[in-house]
Each structure stands twice: as structure tokens, then as C-alpha cells.
Amino acid sequence: MDAVRETENEKTFEIYFGGTYTECWSEDYSLAIRYSSRRSVTARRVDGVWRAIGGDAELCAELESASCPAAMREYFDAAATVYAAARDCVERGLPLERLRECLPVQKSAYAAAELMRLLMDDCGLKLKAALEICAECCEDCRMADADEKELLPYQPRTAHIVSVLRDVSSKQLTAVHDARSIRFRCPVGAVRSGEELRLSFRLASGKINSAALVLYGDDLDLEYAMESSGELYSAYIAPQSPAALWYCFHLDTDEGERWLCPDGSGYYGRLYSERRSGFRLTVFCRDFETPAWFRRSVMYQIFPDRFAFSDDDTASRGIEYHKSLGQTPELHKSLDEPVRYWPREFETSYSPDDFYGGTLRGIESKLPYLKELGVTCLYLNPIVEARSNHRYDSSDYLKVDPILGTNEDFTHLCVTARGMGIRIMLDGVYSHTGADSVYFNRYGAYPDTGACQGTQSPYYSWYDFRHFPDDYRCWWGFKDLPEVNERNGAWQDFVVSGEDSVVKTWLRRGASGWRLDVADELPDDTLALIRSAVKSVDPDAPVLGEVWEDAVIKESYGGRRNYALGYSLDSVMNYPFRAAALDFIHRRIDAFVLRDFLISQQMNYPAPMYYSLMNLLGTHDTDRIRTALATSTTIRGMSREDQLRLRFDDESLRLALRREKLCAVLQFAIPGVPSIYYGDEQGMCGVGDPFNRLPFREGDNELHDLYAQLANMRGANPALSTGDAVFMAYNADILLVLRYVRGGVDHFGASAENGAFLAVINRGAAQCFDVECPEEYDFGRLSGLADEFSAKIIKV
């Protein structure tokens, strides 16, 4: 590619003028162009303007003079821009089919002609493939504003391409739609019900008889006629009902039907001869909002038995209480004792009832540590009375487990935390109870009449017995976890909607929000009922659901769930983000794929939920992030014995710490609520449950300091919490995240300090980056040095 040749190891390009050319056809009808008698200048971009800095002195003088002919200057600028983009494309490891990643849309007709010449002559592309790329990158493929006679003296081959383009663009059909661009989709992203939305495509070349927008979902399939304004075809719609929808464009041509549907990115259009999956469109409730404080928060997740310990006999007294119920808890004598994962002599299977003795008073004693770390939201795994150490088998919904403390301890913790700017979110387990509970009372340990004692129990109707009392519906077949009937009126009144319900009581005791365990297991109408109950007590309390997949299009139990449409949840656990971050670090995907994933979440989640997503790297249900980064082995699903056989040498663990720093910067750079699983900021390791739930240890100060720096930077700069976001990839290794506030207001229109920050995440060798920010954001080019295997957030 002589057009993309470097000189002196700088970003300079040889631009050729005049001369003659010969078309040379091979036996297989491949075309090669031979040039002769050409003159050239060296071009370099200086302060955003292309300058002729060397080469033919006469040409340089003419190009730099005020009297330079317009056609000559336009060709020079167009050629230099096209060559720079082509080289950038090669250096970034992209195929030419993705040249649009490197070339902002060009309005110059000469740019289209010169790009076609480059693609066909220098790169060997066939005319159709070259035209498709050209249509994506250039406005004027029809050569409406081009004069080949004016161009002829400066570049005869490109002048000839003008006439070629003019001819082929009248016959060959190309169309452009980019769902990320306000030109084609306004507004971009999810829309509120009843909000007007314009969807457009540009007919870059060829002719059509008519075009229609096809809008469809689970319960509709509609067509809207589109009107044209020049090359732009548009339809205006205002969907009235919240739903996960899709759309595509139906083109009628003399040659038959064509469908403009997304390519693999999910947002860029391609023409197909048959209808394919469409572009996604989320319509959510018009009045849906999420708590502003939560969108700005930094979350810290605590497994209560393992985080902090009080210098008293709270835990030991709690152990004795559980023993009095006929249970078999064990209290470790030391934090150094290994966690138990095997069945005891009297058991046939492992029972997670070994305790280290963490307490609520212990958590309160660590509040200064959490405040210094920058935490503003504390998410506690279940704290109510239960048989197990994880407490997802609730025994008494209204009582703090005695091993942790008392209800009064909880209220005191909430008051103290709130005084330090920290709010507390509780974990609600409402799809099932424990079998050994006040409500089910399978073993008769509680004095109250439980469901297993007969129909006279006030809780009997909560459960579904197939054959009383031993055969009943239970969670995933676990007999210790009987499922409840969430549509039962008595259950709803006790747990959700009654004046003194479980949900409302804990909010009045000081909690500031709820995380709902296994939200998949709760019907949509029950989730909506919980939301209503929560908001009736505290409109500022978030409701967060455990959802492992894309919550917008999640299907379970035979239907599409409405988690993200504004009916029920404010937020979900963003496990897909964790998976994408790990895939990027382990080189299973590149920065372009990661960027596309981040854009897809930004576009498909309603903004109030998107900025509230719980962006996690680890939880009690995953292997710890440091461990996940130390190995490419998939740990989830392995037996506990096999997990313990995994060995990590010092080098692997050191590498994992470096990798975790990259993940942490990414986590704090994107919109949403960054969540730290206790101890991850100290570099704690651990495979799956229960080895990811070990007692908290202080360890890596450098890692801790990074998390504190990131959290406090986010807290001090609205741009990093509720500012707008732009995602870019320089090459396979470098991801860029631009966050900014302009005009004194954030994404939600709230008053906010102006500012802009750029996160640079580089998983590869040290290298310079230089990218053009999308035109609509008006940030121009962003460039700098990315150190080897590093991540940083810099002020722009």
C-alpha cells in the first residue's frame, strides 16, 4: 500500500499528484494500477490541519499559499485523511471492513473517490466491497458535488473513480444505520413510554421503491411507512407500552426485498436478502426513576459472619441459642482455622453451619475503615435468624440472628453508618424459607405452630404440600428450602404489603434498601408489590434484584421478565460485566468486543437503571476476583475437592494483582454502582463457596490504596458517577472510557460540576494511542501514552 507508507517513523504520509497510470489486467481478471511521472508531498497533521511539510517544493508552496486552488486543497486534505485512517486501521489490527472505526464520516466527495481508489487499487478489494465500506465512511458516494475535470490535473486516477462511483452508486444498493448515532436514532438508547422516537437510515447508493420500519416484540409486529428527505429515510414512533422490542428496515427494490438489520456489533446495519434479528429498543415506564444517592454510591458487600468481630460473647451466646433448637452449629476457635466443607460423622452431606463469629457490632467498628475506603452503601448478606452461616434459609424474618447480635444492634449500626455518609442495604430471601423455621417448623424446634404442624398453622397456606407433611415444593429440590407461594394473600400481607410487613419493618429499623435474592423465582407481580411496599416507606430506597443475565431480555418460567421496564426493580447485579472484564483480561475477547458490550448495556438499559447497575467483580456466589484472574480455568461447577487441588504460584498471584488493578479502574470508570466484595480490596483469594467466604484479612496495601483512590475520586467528581459516557477501543488491547459533565448538569439534569476524565485500560505492551472521539461528542482527538499492562483515569 504505497498510499500508507510512513516516513521518518512519524505520522506522515506521501500524497501523490499528477502523472499517468496504466490499468494492467491479469489472466484472472485482477486489476493492477501502474503509475508513472507522479510528484508527491509529505503530509502531517498539525493542530488538526493537514500541512505539506516536505517533498516537491513547488507543490508544497502552492498547497501552503492562500491562493491554492480549492480542488487541489480538498484533494490533499481528503487523501491525507483517508491514508491516515487506513494506516490506523492496520495498526489497530482491524479488517478494512471496519474502517469506519478509524474514519469519521467524510463530507467531501473527493474523500469518497480517493477512498474507493485506495480500497480497490492499493488494497485489492472488489468494487462492491469497496463501495460498502465507502458508504459507511463518506456522505457523497453519488458524487453529486464532485467535478472530475477539476480533479483531473491533481490526481487523474481518482478523477476517473469519480465517474466510476457516479455510475455504480446509481445501481448498487447500500444503506447505513448506526443505532449509536443521534443522526439515525433520536434519542439514542432506551426511551420512556409515549416518548417520540425517530429511526432513520441513509440510502447511500442505489434506488428503492419504498421503505418501512418494522417494529416487533413478543406481542406485536408492526410496520411504519418511512418518508425520505434526500438520502435520509425516517419514521417517527411513540411506543405506548413498556416492552423489550426490536426493529429493522424493510426496503422494496426492483430486484426484490432487502432488510437492513444489525451486524455482529448489534448496532451497525447490514443489508440482507432475508429478515434477521433486529436492533434492540427498550421502552420503559414513563415515570420510572431510581434513587439519585444510589446512582452516586460506592457499594461494599459483606458476608456478615466473616467480616468483623466484636470483643464480647455475642457470637458464643448465639451459638448456644441455635444449639437449644437442636441445631449443630460450630464456632471456630480461631480465624486461622480452615473453613469446613465436608460432612461430619453424623451427616450424609455438607452442612454450612460452621461460624467464625462475625457480628453487627464488629461491622460498626469497621465503619471508619469503610469510610476511608470511600464506601457509601453497605450491602449485607442476610442477617436474620437462620440455621446456616450464609443465612439464605431464613428461620425468623423479623429477628437478627443472635450470633450477629440484636435488632437494637442493627438500628444502632444504621444510625452510626448514616452519620458517616453510609447507607445499609439488606438481603431479602423471599422465594423460600428454611425448613427449620418459625414458618415451616419441620423439626418442631420452634414453639409456634408451623406449616408442618398442620392446617391450623397461620403459615400453612404459604407452602404447597403434595403429600403432607413430607412431600412439598422446594427450591431446586433442596428439602431444607421449602418454596413459598408468593401470590398467597397471607404470605403477601406478612412479608410485603401489611403495615408491619417484613419489608417495611426493616426499613423503619434503619435499612435504606433491599437486594432481592433469586429474583427469577419471584413473579413479576410480586416484585412490583415489593417495590410498591418499599417506596411507600422510603421512596429513596432502591430495590435490587439478583439477576445473572441481561435483565432487559431475560426469560424465565415461560415468559419475558419485566425487571428493567420500571415496574419492579431499580437495579440488578451486573454479572455480565464481570464476565466481560474477565474475558478481556484473559484475552478471550478484544477491546472492540468489550467496547461493544459496554455500549450495548448503555443503549439497552433504561438510563435510571443503567446508572444504578451493581457493577461487581466478585460476590459470595463467585470465585474471588484475584483467584479468577490467576487462572483461566473455569472454577464454577467444579467440585469442592477439585477446587482445592488448584494451585497458584507466587508469579500467578502477582500477575492476578496487576490484572485486578485493570479491572478495578474499568469498574469505577463506567456508569453504575461499583461494588467491592469484602476483602477484594486487600487481595484476598478464594475459589468457590465456601472458600470465597473466608474471614476478612488485611493484606495488599497498594491494592487497597488504589480502590480508595478510585472510590474517592468518583465521589468527588460527578463526571465519574452520573456524567455521560463514551466507550472507545484504540486496538485489541486498549479500551478508553470518556466520562464528562458539560453545561453544569449531569445525565439526569441535576446540577453538577463540569469536568471530563479519560480511563485508559491497556492489557498489552506500552504504546501510544490516538483516537477520534465520535463527532457528536465534540471532544476531537484523544491521544497519549498507555504504559505496559496498566490502567489509569486522567483528567481531560
Residue ranges and their predicted role:
Residues M1-Q172:
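A conserved ligand/cofactor-binding region detector
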Residues K171-R296, F309:
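Glycan-association/targeting regions that enable binding to alpha-glucans and other polysaccharides
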Residues C186-V188, E195-S200, M728-P774:
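Carbohydrate-binding surface patches
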Residues S205, A244, V298, G780-V796:
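C-terminal beta-strand-rich structural cap/linker in extracellular carbohydrate-active enzymes
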Residues F303-T376, I383-R509, I530-S536, I553:
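Substrate-binding/active-site clefts of carbohydrate-active enzymes
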Residues D305, Y557-G558, A564, D570-S571, ...:
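Aromatic/acidic polysaccharide-binding cleft in carbohydrate-active enzymes
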Residues C414-R423, S431-H432, S437-D448, S512, ...:
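Active-site-proximal helices and loops of the catalytic beta/alpha 8
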Residues F696-Y730:
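Aromatic- and carboxylate-lined catalytic core of secreted/periplasmic carbohydrate-active enzymes
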